[in-house]
Design a protein with these regions (language model features):
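Amphipathic alpha-helical packing segments from all-alpha helical-bundle domains
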Residues: 90, 124-150
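Amphipathic alpha-helical segments used for helix-helix packing
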Residues: 107-132, 177-178
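Alpha-helical DNA-contacting segments of helix-turn-helix folds
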Residues: 58-64, 68-71, 134
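Short, leucine-enriched amphipathic alpha-helices that occur as contiguous helical runs
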Residues: 7, 11-15, 19
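Hydrophobic alpha-helical connector segments
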Residues: 73-112, 159-166
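N-terminal intrinsically disordered/low-complexity leader segments
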Residues: 1-9, 72, 76-80
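Helix-turn-helix
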Residues: 13, 21-55, 59-63
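All-alpha amphipathic helical-bundle segments outside canonical DNA-binding/catalytic cores
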Residues: 130-133, 150-167
């Protein structure tokens, strides 16, 4: 029974509108009333589907942000399959293209980046969830790819800083388009 109500169109509309409003105004900047009005739902629907505003916020990240991040990562991996053996320049180029010209439409990219920027500026429990489930595994995968291509004797900390620097530059240009 609970599963049927979770799939209702009101829940999807709430997730859609909450994502847009959270991206534009942040968690604290939007009220439950504003979200339900935008979604055309009853005020009690946030409680009914999510329990509270905080849970709705987490669900926006879980069911909207995380799948988009996985699409970007998959786009990166697919690009890498076109060239064997891998080179440092191909990894960096593929990473940049996945974030700058990747699989997201303009509206998805804008929401995705605004949500992340707001979460970084005012962290909540969502940031730890994203770090554990998306960011750390992806960053580990990236450094594992880079390790055999960098000079022998390079310290692990230097590799991590280099990878973070590359990633930061790509994100800087990607976020600059918001």
């Amino acid at each position: 029974m609970a599963e049927n109500r979770m799939r209702g169109p009101s829940k999807e509309r709430l997730l859609d509108e909450a994502e847009i409003l959270f991206a534009e105004k942040g968690f604290e900047g939007v009220s439950v009333r504003e979200m339900t009005r935008a979604a055309g739902c009853n005020l009690a629907s946030v409680n009914y589907y999510f329990g509270n505003k905080e849970n709705l916020y987490m669900e926006v990240f879980r069911y909207r942000w995380m799948p988009r991040a996985k699409r970007i990562h998959n786009n990166f991996r697919q690009s890498l399959q076109t060239q064997k053996p891998l080179s440092l320049s191909h990894i960096i180029q593929s990473l940049g293209m996945a974030f700058l010209r990747g699989p997201l439409c303009e509206e998805e990219r804008r929401c995705h980046q605004q949500l992340m920027a707001r979460e970084l500026a005012q962290p909540t429990a969502a940031l730890e969830m994203l770090a554990q489930e998306i960011m750390r595994p992806f960053f580990q995968e990236l450094t594992d790819m880079l390790r055999p291509l960098v000079p022998e004797g390079l310290e692990e900390s230097e590799l991590m800083l280099g990878a973070m620097g590359i990633f930061a530059m790509i994100l800087y240009f990607s976020f600059g388009r918001v």
